[in-house]
Every structure is written in C-alpha cells, then in structure tokens.
C-alpha cells in the first residue's frame, strides 16, 4: 500500500514539477499565477459570410479585428506571424482569428500569400472571419475594453481569449495598470509582454491537462 502510494507520488512529481518550472520561467512577473481574467462571457463568433464556422469555445485564441483595412495590415500580420504564431501554432487548440469585412476576400488571400512567403509557416490556424461591420462592432463590444474600432472596423490591438470565452490579460501591468490587449504594431511589446502571456496561458492548460490525466490514472 505504502509502496504504491510512494510510486504515485513520484510519478506525480515527475509529471507536474517540469510544468511548474516551465510556468515559473515563462511567466515573468506573473510567476505561478494564472493569467488574470479581465472579461467573462465574451460573445461566441457569428457564422461567417462565406459559411465559416469558427468557434472560440475550447480554443486558445489570438483575436483581432481588421475590418476593411487589410491593405495596411501586412506589417502587423508579419509581426504576429513571426513572433507568436510561428512559435506556438503547434500547440493543441491554439488559433488566430481575425474579423474582416465581407468584401475582403481577395485581400485575405494576398495576405495569406505574404505570410507563407515571409516565414514559410503552415498557416492553417490563421482564420479570417468575413462578416458585417455591425457584427464586428457587436462582438468587439462584448470584450468590454476601453478601445474602439475605427470606421473600417479596425484596431491594431489583439486579444487573448481562453477556452471558456474569457478575455485574459494583466491587472498589474507596470505601464498601463490593466493590459487588455497587445499592439500588433509594436515588436517591443510583443517581445516583452505578449510572448510571456501566451506562454503562461498555454502552460496553464497543459498543467491542468496533466493533472486531469494523472487523476484518471489513479
């Protein structure tokens, strides 16, 4: 009995300890804390104009709103592709989703071509949701942030949405106090903050999965 218990304890430590170490080093000042929830019950995604059925539920999502402004989004897209997507796209349930205007079909394809040409990455987890300006505004308002979309339905800010449709971010950021989103124009902010925060939320879910699997094996 004691031997079995000791064996389970050792196995538990072997599974969990490396994840705790990873979480500690990946999370910067967040240490072992989960990435804070800033807004709960973000709206689920509407069905796309082209029949897209992309969902936030049960996904870890980098969410953006580019509206009808794709011609000016190449730099932001390449920043995110190189610094975030390329680094994390192989994690289960990780995705990028960007709202775009219903008439941006050609522009989306051109941008995808640039992304592939830029880093040669599999971009199957880059999702573009074609929808109306009204749908974009309605969904954006459910984030409950201080930001606004411009007239074309665009913002340079991208958001982390967890599997339960909650907006994650920082509530103790040294620069802004509450950090709702990341400026895709700023390589410095992506490097300094966004990479760390994506690592934290991915490690959080990996740790939860390890604990769940460990409990099932008992």
For each feature predicted by the language model, list its residue ranges.
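Surface-exposed short loop/turn segments
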Residues: 132-154
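Short active-site neighborhood of thiol/selenol oxidoreductases, capturing the structured segment around
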Residues: 53-81, 96
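Solvent-exposed coil/turn segments that connect beta secondary-structure elements
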Residues: 68, 102, 133-134, 163-165
